[in-house]
Amino acid sequence: MEQKHRSEFPEKELWDLTALYQDREDFLRAIEKAREDINQFSRDYKGNLHTFEDFEKAFAELEQIYIQMSHIGNYSFMPQTTDYGNEDFANIAQAGMDFETDASVALTFFDDALVAADEEVLDRLGDLPHLTAAIRQAKIKKAHYLGADVEKTLTNLGEVFYSPQDIYTKMRAGDFEMADFEAHGKTYKNSFVTYENFYQNHEDAEVREKSFRSFSEGLRKHQNTAAAAYLAQVKSEKLLADMKGYDSVFDYLLAEQEVDRAMFDRQIDLIMKDFAPVAQRYLKHVAKVNGLEKMTFADWKLDLDSALNPEVSIEDAYDLVMKSVEPLGQEYCQEVARYQEERWVDFAANSGKDSGGYAADPYRVHPYVLMSWTGRLSDVYTLIHEIGHSGQFIFSDNHQSYFNAHMSTYYVEAPSTFNELLLSDYLEHQSDDPRQKRFALAHRLTDTYFHNFITHLLEAAFQRKVYTLIEEGETFGASKLNSIMKEVLTEFWGDAIEIDDDAALTWMRQAHYYMGLYSYTYSAGLVISTAGYLHLKHSETGAEDWLNLLKSGGSKTPLESAMIIGADISTDKPLRDTIQFLSDTVDQIINYSAQLGE
């Protein structure tokens, strides 16, 4: 599949950024306006923040500045992710990055004053409903504050600290070139996006195998550069952890999530130990149904029933999304239904585009979603996942101050994966045919849980080993990273999948390693979304409670938020319940196969 240029796609498949700014000039004017407001704020409050009343007034004005920064920050990076080869987009991104650095430096005096404030002042500010999250975070920072000069220097170095991720992202979008491959006498084009979104799920074994080898060879050419970028990332995080007096880099990276190391380790350890046998059982069943004597890493994304993997249009996907979210009620449906008419989503699978997907949240404008549409059902899962994030953004933004709107990273993936469960539930109940039901349950596993409970969880297990190396004063290169990834994959998959040296390059496929301890939160969020889904199925207040969770934003801690839907994540019960739910799902799938004589 050869990728088209962005100009070849119809307007309806491209997002409309004019809800933010009309054009580049409008964007640049917004930057100048924000600079003026920041300068005035500095003149008014620098050296004048002492009392509760001082801070209360300053917070009100600072919120308006942060909202401007939210709009500028989102607009600056989004265009470039649609085409990394576009110089105009690169210039917009640089202008936004320069502004963000300058603004952050100019406003450090406020953070310095806040963490230096008396506990009594912080306690009174924390009692204000619109500042609960900001003050919780301030108290966390206060315990590890390095002083005004050092903190300002670190802020000035923000762009430098971001460089490893920037290098990796641009390398993945612009430098990863996959050679053409031949299968059954036919030549196929390959790329990062087409492999990830199309070939790895292909029903033909030779296409899967040959595309995987082409894909892996393309990765291998850049493994040393990728390893160097990743080493720079983790060494800088370790340096900051030590400077700030944390016991370990793990404690430093988990602090702002408001969870402890035990919750991080529990997520990885229980899934590696108790969910791995469930996943192995399912893949062995897939191999049996598809007549495979062995399953390689090129095969593990194979659909259980490839013949029932229909092409889906963007228009059909809209209907699927809206029908799936109906159980959440009119209030939710009316908000997310806007995504089509207002063109929130950038669907075009054009050359130079970021291969991933994301949802962006310019505060109280409307969300934006980036993805690459290839017409497979997995794309519908990606879409409804990002619409899940979007729904949370809308409800949090509408019901919380800017300071309280952002969920903890620990469970930020709950709203997105919850929507995936609604899609699978809708598909499952569209027919009494065992083949159709098996199809829906299989996609529940492969498109939701395998992605979040396996792909991202194994990233987290890999990360834990890498950070442990750094904690012990060691270093690494590409060879060591390949070895660690191969070890993690082998531990999880056992004899269900043949793990080779190409599989060991999997660490090169995700940008999550540049986002701290983010990967494990996909499974943590999915535990909360599973609890919410089961609560929706079994409680009359399930939909209302879920919307209340979305509306709470970051106003509560992760433990408090999960209790809104009755999930006590201080224990391992929600995680064990989720694993049991998945084991039951595999049993159902195998039972349907037996009914079909397979």
Predicted regions and their residues:
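Long, K/E/R/D-enriched contiguous segments that form extended
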Residues: 288-327, 333, 392, 439-441, ...
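Catalytic zinc-binding patch centered on the HExxH motif and its immediate surroundings
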Residues: 307-312, 345-365
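A well-structured
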Residues: 1-306, 318, 591-598
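Active-site recognition of the HExxH zinc-binding catalytic motif
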Residues: 245, 374-394, 416, 421, ...
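Short pre-active-site segment immediately N-terminal to the catalytic Zn-binding motif
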Residues: 309-314, 362-384
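Conserved helix-loop functional segments at active or binding sites
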Residues: 323-334, 360, 389, 393-401, ...
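Post-HExxH zinc-binding segment in Zn-dependent metallohydrolases
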Residues: 407-436, 445-447, 451, 525
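C-terminal, non-catalytic "cap/extension" segments appended to globular domains
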Residues: 8-11, 22, 110, 114-115, ...
